[in-house]
Amino acid sequence: MNAPQTNDTAADGAATEAIAADSGRRALTRREQKEAYENNKLFKRIARQVGQAIGDYNMIEAGDKVMVCLSGGKDSYAMLDVLLRLRERAPIDFDIVAVNLDQKQPGFPEHVLPEYLTQIGVPFHIENQDTYSIVKRLVPEGKTTCSLCSRLRRGILYRVAGELGATKIALGHHRDDILQTLLLNMFYGGKLKGMPPKLQSDDGRNVVIRPLAYVKETDLEKYAELREFPIIPCNLCGSQPNLKRAEMKALIREWDKRFPGRVDNMFSALANVVPSHLMDTGLFPFASLRATGVADPLGDIAFDEEPCASGDATGDAAGNTTSGAARPISIVQFDDL
């Protein structure tokens, strides 16, 4: 699917409408005008990044039925909201169905999502499965339940996708999730592995997409506040948060504050891989490498300092650098669906 176009006239002025409705027909103050302008810019930025990711990885094709997995958190709400708006001006036709898995966690507000989805007119399916009791029975007290819960949830959602005739399963992972996963796998797993923007599921029957792959979490936080989504708490199961992932989140946010451009460059690096300069013999034939006598401009310059080592290059959220040609950027489980 080609990335849907976003422009000043077509972009949704959600903030402007909200403020205008709130203030009747009176003229907006300068502050309100500025807020409306900034919020409109926020939507356009998110919509542009989602559209770009969809286009870069051909996430959605004509005739697709996209199953949007809706947890009740800010990310999945934003994903559904933006996909619905992009569909209005997309060059192709595709269907959207929202799916929530009610795992029967104590205190889960069953009415929230059905009421919201009915209000906005989106076809939806609520899958009721008491995985909470299964996890509590199998996992010792005090141990994290996230891994087993994730596997159960994944299997159920794959089955539901088949029953609904969905051709794509959309998950709400964003740019920060991808970078956190990369660091977790490097620091604790000994792997250079991230979270792909598009993949075939482990059962071989589904294609999973991550339309928010280019979007910063801070933008999603602002967008959720602006749109006033009815957020459902994510810790109803009582499980302890993933402390290692929380560490990675804090690390990335600290870098973003102290070293502008560093996190963007990290993300850009995921799409600029040079196998010959890594150490995986499965990716590059080091054993058979011989001098050919033919100059190779991409060959290793051995004793010279790499140009990028100076730290002069800075990247943006779309993966473009100021020290070289602009390139489309890639995306990327510690295993949490």
Curated annotation (Swiss-Prot):
SUPFAM superfamilies: Adenine nucleotide alpha hydrolases-like (SSF52402). This is tRNA-cytidine(32) 2-sulfurtransferase. Keywords: 4Fe-4S, ATP-binding, Cytoplasm, Iron, Iron-sulfur, Magnesium, Metal-binding, Nucleotide-binding, RNA-binding, Transferase, tRNA processing, tRNA-binding. [4Fe-4S] cluster binds at residues 146, 149, 237. It is an enzyme of class 2 (transferase). It comes from the Bacteria. The keyword Cytoplasm applies. Binds 1 [4Fe-4S] cluster per subunit. The cluster is chelated by three Cys residues, the fourth Fe has a free coordination site that may bind a sulfur atom transferred from the persulfide of IscS. GO terms for molecular function: 4 iron, 4 sulfur cluster binding; ATP binding; magnesium ion binding; sulfurtransferase activity; tRNA binding. It catalyses: cytidine(32) in tRNA + S-sulfanyl-L-cysteinyl-[cysteine desulfurase] + AH2 + ATP = 2-thiocytidine(32) in tRNA + L-cysteinyl-[cysteine desulfurase] + A + AMP + diphosphate + H(+). Belongs to the TtcA family. Catalyzes the ATP-dependent 2-thiolation of cytidine in position 32 of tRNA, to form 2-thiocytidine (s(2)C32). The sulfur atoms are provided by the cysteine/cysteine desulfurase (IscS) system. The lineage of its organism: Bacteria, Pseudomonadati, Pseudomonadota, Betaproteobacteria, Burkholderiales. It holds the Pfam family ATP_bind_3. Gene3D superfamilies: HUPs. Pathway: tRNA modification. Its cofactor is Mg(2+); [4Fe-4S] cluster. It comes from Burkholderia vietnamiensis (strain G4 / LMG 22486) (Burkholderia cepacia (strain R1808)). Its EC number is 2.8.1.-. The thiolation reaction likely consists of two steps: a first activation step by ATP to form an adenylated intermediate of the target base of tRNA, and a second nucleophilic substitution step of the sulfur (S) atom supplied by the hydrosulfide attached to the Fe-S cluster. One of its GO terms (biological process) is tRNA thio-modification. It is found in: Cytoplasm. One of its GO terms (cellular component) is cytoplasm. Homodimer. A motif (PP-loop motif) lies at residues 71-76.
